[in-house]
A protein has these predicted regions:
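N-terminal pre-first-transmembrane soluble regions of secretory-pathway and organelle membrane proteins
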Residues: 1-3, 15
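Short, charged, surface-exposed hinge/linker loops at domain edges
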Residues: 3, 8, 23-63, 94-150
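Conserved short-loop catalytic and cofactor-binding motifs
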Residues: 6, 10, 77-80
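Polyanion-binding surface elements
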Residues: 9-20
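Generic structural signal for individual residues within well-ordered alpha-helical segments
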Residues: 19, 90-93
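Short aromatic-glycine-(Arg/Gly/Cys) micro-motifs in beta-strand/loop hairpins
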Residues: 59-78
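A short, exposed loop/beta-hairpin motif centered on an aromatic-Gly-Thr core
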Residues: 78-90
Length: 150
């Protein structure tokens, strides 16, 4: 266990070094690999958006789809408690994409509160996925829909 800790410590760059060599560190993160950074007892991770997008690739937005009595479509998001309706599936998907992105922005703006709430902590990967995509139409198009039971 101690050997593993020493190996991990070898990967960590000190914050003072990062500050002094900021431009070189940024270039390295963008073109080479992420960095682990330590400031006193705090540890953090610095990467480009491509890397975090790859990590988040395993997270999917899934919905249950309901056909209402008026033939509109309602989508219920499984990962986050969001429900949206539209005249057809495409409109419902777009509405859900907008709702996901709106929630992601609110979550990020109130990150300290939301990320510490036990029922919302698991939303973190979905929040960052939505913020990185930053396009309600793309988010709506990537929804994986299954038929729900009315």
């Amino acid at each position: 266990m101690e050997v593993l800790k020493e190996m991990i410590d070898m990967l960590v760059e000190q914050a003072t070094t990062v500050r002094k060599e900021w431009s070189a560190v940024c270039d390295s993160v963008i073109h080479e690999k992420p960095k682990f950074i330590k400031r006193t007892r705090d540890k953090m991770w610095f990467s480009n958006l491509e890397t975090i997008s790859e990590i988040l690739e395993v997270y999917h937005f899934t919905t249950l789809k309901y056909i209402e009595d008026d033939n509109t479509i309602t989508l219920s998001l499984n990962e986050i408690d969001l429900i949206e309706n539209g005249r057809n599936e495409q409109e419902a998907r777009l509405n859900m994409g907008k709702a996901i992105l709106d929630y992601a922005l609110e979550y990020y703006n109130e990150y300290q509160m939301y990320s510490r709430s036990p029922n919302r902590k698991k939303h973190i990967p979905y929040i960052f996925k939505a913020l990185i995509i930053d396009d309600p139409e793309k988010i709506g198009d990537m929804l994986q829909c299954q038929n729900g039971k009315n």
